[in-house]
Amino acid sequence: MKKDYKKVFLKNTKEERIKENSNYLRGTIIDDLKDEITNGFTGDNFSLIRFHGMYQDDRDLRLERNEQKLEPRYAMMLRCRLPRGIIKAKKWLKIDHFASKNTLYGTIRLNNLQTFQFHGILKKTLKDAHKMLNKIGLDSLGTANDVNRNVLCTSNPMESLIHQQCYEWVSKISNFLLPQTKAYAEIWLNQKKIATTDQEPILGKTYLPRKFKTTVVVPPYNDVDLYANDMNFIAITKNNKIVGFNVLIGGGLSINHGNKNTWPFLAVELGYITLEKTLSVAESIVTTQRDWGNRTDRKNAKTRYTIAKVGLSVFKKEVEKRANMTFETIKPYYFISRGDRFGWTKNINNDWSLTVFIQNGRIYDNDKQLVKSGLLKIANLHTGNFRLTANQNIVISEILDKNKKKIEEIAISHGLIKKVSSLRENSMACVSFPTCPLAIAESERILSFFITKVENIMLKYGIEKEIIILRISGCPNGCGRSLLAEIGLIGKSLGRYNLYIGGNRIGSRIPKIYKENITEQEILIHLDFLIKIWSIERQKKEHFGDFVIRRNVVKKVVNPIYDFWN
């Protein structure tokens, strides 16, 4: 008798009930918006606004307002939907203006989902945010919660004809998998409700069991960290054209401390497809996960757990059945790096791109750099695009020859072109405190200082020009992608972290825990020792992560289901 995996799980979670009863993500959000007494969204709406691209929290003001016996002052984070990470420079002017005038922090945050987000929007100005985005052709629908999130793309589609084709496929996939509900337009843009029944032919009435992430990648660069994502399309080319995709599925990095039923996992190969099958295969992968994914335990609801439960071959056969096709054998591909290439690049149409490093992706001005002001000046002059990268940096692209010198002068004078170490350029941190509701340890706010201390260690041993992929996450939810780093810190409690080592340079190996629940000072002592022996004993051009595996400092993670925790 054939097993029906859709019926394996019986009792659904609270989140499933919320989606079921939400009337296609409407809930009573409109009522909460009309309520001028409370600052936030209540009940089910607290969860539902995430489908509209927002998170709510008050943690940076909670203690102070509790002591003053005041009602919580909630503020929202809003994340834009920006498939492929591209935005016209002129549209940036509106984004900058909104951040300056309508957020508590006055900053813009680039994230590693290749888009930007605002922090500190009060409820009374939320509609203004959505209307502003709508005026420049953007929205925030589906950038959070149980849907296909922002689709990532290799960063610079202007670099070659292949990159331009990649760019077009990202748009097709993103639009194809977007929620069809009219709730977003009705609530945030005051669009009149039409007396028809909503339908979600791909996502379904209760949407997906958990968040779902997709990438489109042009080898040999893995800047999007494809192995961390649910569904990935690796471009295969012939005669300067994309002819098909290798399809990989089931990647993900979130864990729960101490819960051995959770584990990170690298995306695995399904097979090769020709271009005309792309959308039907994408739909079939998503709907298989929709129907078979775990809706009773959100900690085991991601695609990788579905594959582990039913087996890759069974999952693959179901996708082939739904798409009415058969996967071909994987085509050869390889990766050489995943970092951004900073500085000037000449594009195929003879204009220019300038990639600039943005520490932590945080766009603001301070006494050392005028990043926000500099980008604003460039946006006023520039006729091309800003392209956001999955490493939280910006590519100023399609720069005309006549503007190149002026843009370079602005970039230099505002600190956008500035020599920093390779270690710093390849570092990353999630937002964490004070605005992330899941944070349990510092991340973004300490990264720069921590990198300086590691830079000093590397200088001491004469290897200050070397690259180490170092990342910090304020909780084990995976946003900082620390579990694909050569050195990864994951917050365990305030001021304490688990230290993981042994990932590789291209992001295709999960690191192993080296020390648990230790302070920053203890971490630096351990790193001093490890970097010292690496500098002395490494083989020619041997990377740090490869060295600690070869030296048996930690065991290589081969199958994280069995050996990540052991």
UniProtKB/Swiss-Prot annotation:
Give its E.C. classification number. 1.8.1.2
Q: What is the free-text note on the cofactor? A: Binds 1 siroheme per subunit.
**What GO terms describe the biological role, i.e. biological process, of this protein?**
cysteine biosynthetic process; hydrogen sulfide biosynthetic process; sulfate assimilation
Q: Which reaction does it catalyse?
A: hydrogen sulfide + 3 NADP(+) + 3 H2O = sulfite + 3 NADPH + 4 H(+)
Q: Name one GO molecular function term.
A: heme binding
PROSITE patterns assigned: NIR_SIR
According to UniProt, this protein's pathway is: Sulfur metabolism; hydrogen sulfide biosynthesis; hydrogen sulfide from sulfite (NADPH route): step 1/1
Q: Which positions in this protein are listed as binding siroheme?
A: C479
Q: Binding of [4Fe-4S] cluster: at which residues?
A: C430, C436, C475, C479
Any one cellular component term from GO for this entry? Answer: sulfite reductase complex (NADPH)
Cofactor names from the entry are:
siroheme; [4Fe-4S] cluster
Q: What does this protein do?
A: Component of the sulfite reductase complex that catalyzes the 6-electron reduction of sulfite to sulfide. This is one of several activities required for the biosynthesis of L-cysteine from sulfate.
Q: Do you know which NCBIfam families this protein is assigned to? A: CysI (TIGR02041), PRK13504.1 (NF010029)
Q: Which PANTHER family match?
A: SULFITE REDUCTASE [NADPH] SUBUNIT BETA, SULFITE REDUCTASE [NADPH] SUBUNIT BETA-RELATED
Q: What is this protein called?
A: Putative sulfite reductase [NADPH] hemoprotein beta-component
What species is this protein from? Buchnera aphidicola subsp. Schizaphis graminum (strain Sg)
- Gene designation: cysI
